């Protein structure tokens, strides 16, 4: 009996082993069939719009190695074949010839719309930041999400839930190793470069509008809608000082890149300069008649200028030596929302407004190299014309402007729930200024959207149809159904145009 049972067990085990082999053979055959079908399918080439700065950067390095960098840089001829002569932004900034700097208005302003990026679940975008190496763009939305886009091909890379409430501010440290974010509920978070969250601070009782690092990254500054600013120790996350002096929401703050000086702009229409060591206000700048929305120190050049914009439709440039405004720009039709200095050209700024417009200004013709006005007879409110205007850059208010670290790209984002990329236009490109961003003609307009697909933006037809008048129905054209009868055709001899009954 024992032997019989063992034989039965062996036979059952052999059957199970054979069944497993058959199943494995079937699955392998199935996988091979799928691979053959996929291999037999014709693969379509995917075209992707790319902004590649490697060519002109390499050409510039070759010129520098040959000693050509110190020679005058002429204007590019208005032909597409001369695109090879377009150099990177640092080339025009480093050239010592004064008249070449003025050529910047033609060769080095971000006027060409390149790409539109938006998430599937769309939310208003409050702030954006390029990663320190410039390869990616970090977008922070009202939903508390981080979205990362490729900085050259503009395709989607990743998304993560970073905060529980709307993210209002982002700031990278000067050593490029840390990222700070602040949200609507007053929470501050520390992030490593791989977006690993290592620390959380309950910093304010209201939304954190702006964050700035000290020059040595040992401290950072936050401003909030609770009308206060705070200086924090970065290493232990402890509050060191509280700067109290504004009587309303503090909308913007910045720490000078070299000096021990802090600037803040508030809803009380005042700009205040602070000593971070004494927690005291050293000066108050007047002149604005409405909320100050953004204040930024000059990051390059002499670093003696301060740019600020307000909801009174003006932008003011202050000289830190005299504590007075040396330029007042009133070129927008609506309130201004943000301002950004160019990272390479010290005299170039970009402003954005709540109506979605964006202007570029080059102040070389108004301010000389030593930041003293060229014409002392003109007052500071003399009219200044924009070097370039983009009247319909966004459909709604622009909340953020951010230049690429190399200066050849600009990203703008706002309440229309999209981030848009701008580059320098090609020489004599007829399509650079003929799209909907300049003409506002959105009927049949297109944008390069997510993954470089063309997203049609079609406005509803304004033609009215009278239901009581049958003849008005001929104005309605259904796609793919052209030249169909609409029921109003003439019926001569009682037959009309019925197929097969001609000549009656």
Curated annotation (Swiss-Prot):
Keywords: Chromosome partition, mRNA processing, Nucleus, Repeat, WD repeat
Origin: domain of life: Eukaryota
Compartments it resides in: Nucleus
Entries under PROSITE patterns matching the protein: WD_REPEATS_2, WD_REPEATS_REGION
A GO biological-process term: chromosome segregation
A Pfam short name: WD40
Protein name according to UniProt: Polyadenylation factor subunit 2
Originating species: Debaryomyces hansenii (strain ATCC 36239 / CBS 767 / BCRC 21394 / JCM 1990 / NBRC 0083 / IGC 2968) (Yeast)
